[in-house]
Structures are given as structure tokens and as C-alpha cells.
Amino acid sequence: MCNTEQQKEKIAEWIFQAIREYYMKKCTFPNDKLHHPELAGKPMAVGGDPEARHGIVLTANYIAKRAGVKTGMALWQARQVCPEIIFVPPRMDLYLRFSRMAQEIYSEYTDQREPFGIDESWLDVTASTSIKGDGMKIAKEISSRIKYELGVTVSIGVSWNKIFAKLGSDYKKPDAITEFSKDNYKDIVWKLPVGDLLM
């Protein structure tokens, strides 16, 4: 087979990452846990001012979510369903700093990066696979580096398209890597609600 045909048949390797310790949509709890270690193991949410009784839950950790706290819920409602919840204010400067540091790591694997908010990105690592290995190998290396260098964990999805890569990052969390390949996606994805495709 000639090189041109090989290139045509090459499957793109997309990686979607999301910086997470607890369930994350906005790069918050990994960093807040680092700066509030005394709150580990307690129900937490990032939100507005609970004393003034205004604001909403921007994100909540797994402990709070198990108690019924949901993203977008008013703070007073979150307190009703989880009386022991602890609210911490958002720290955008901190989240942006972590986001920049993560992007610096990703830049060593590809220049084809598409940020999706401050805590998530699509990485097209197709051009890097001949040097650094397949998508799963690259994902494992990125996961290890983020954990070691930044002190937080990531959930990563690996697939040949962006939607399945994003779905993979949400499928298992926290600190997990999920691959949806052309061999396994029907067995897993077709059983999921269609709303899960872009959570």
C-alpha cells in the first residue's frame, strides 16, 4: 500500500480531557481541594454568597451530589438538601492559572488543541502517534504528568471523533481514561441516552 493510501486510511486520534478531582465542569475542585485540604471528604460546592442567600451552585463534589446537590441549584436549595454543605467562592485567577499550565503540557503533544471552557480541551494527536504511540498511550502519559506536575487528576476520553472523545471523558470519572474505538462503541454508546453525547 502506498503512503498516500495509508494516510487516507489513518484513523484520527482525538483526546478530550477534563481536569477533575471530583466531578468537574469548571476547573474548580481539584484546585480548591489543594488550597482547602481540611475540607477533603466533606460535601463542598463552589457558589455565590450563602449568607446573603443569593447565587447558585457552579459545581459540587461527589459527596454533595450524592446528597442531591445539582449544578445550577440556588444555594439555599442546596443547603436544604445537604445541610452540612460547605460553600467556597470561585477563584477564577487560580482556575485560569491551572488551565494555562495544563495547556503548556498539551502543547508538547500537539498544536491541534481546541479549548472547551477553561477546564476542558480537545487534542488531535494524530500527527504525534508515530512518535509517541497511540491515543491511549498518549492519554496515559498526559494523565500521569498532570497528576505529578499539577497535583490534580484528569478524566480523558480517546476516540476517532470529538463527540465520542468528549463522551469518554464523562463516562468514567474521576481520574479515568476511556477509549471508544470502532470496535467497541456500539456495545457501549448505543445503550446510553442520546443526551449523554454532549454533557
Kindly give the residue locations of the regions a language model identified.
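Gly/Gly-Pro- and Ser/Thr-rich, intrinsically disordered tail segments characteristic of DNA damage-repair
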Residues: 1-199
